[in-house]
Amino acid sequence: IRSCDPLARFLQFYLNMIRGNVFLLNSTNTTEIFEQMIRIDEKDALIGISFPRYSMRTLKAMEFANDRQAKIITITDTIYSPMCLYSSCNLLARSNMVSIVDSLVAPLSLINALVVALCLKRPDDVKKNLESLGQAWDNYQVYLKDEFNYIDESLLSTPLQKEKEQKL
């Protein structure tokens, strides 16, 4: 939510690639968050990300998940953060507001480390998922391949080279 949205999207993208069944709570109002979380229970985990000025919507989502016995993980700046009220695991990273823009460098580094650690815990699953993704990307041409040659190489010849070739 708010300035933490890019961090949450990055984390959700990679967690979904590793495990699947990962959802991003994204909303402009609190009621929509509860609608998205209505099925959360003790088998689920919620990762709340918030830095000063702490988001009340994130805090309320964490409270709701906690009331339903879901596991709560927090990514925040200090143990004194209100985000730590409901979490059993606090991952701390500084987020200094040097100017009008929050610095997300440390939190993003923490998220990178978390993703790598989770990959190391389930290497076979990750390898299988990445191989399946790679196959899908190849089959449906998601990314350009080097073997495609969109440039007609004859057009790269200089006018002088063309003249020489015509004289021969």
Language-model regions, residue ranges each:
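Internal, active-site/partner-interface "lid" segment
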Residues: 122-160, 167
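Glycine-rich phosphate-binding loops that contact phosphosugars or nucleotide phosphates
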Residues: 1-109, 113-122
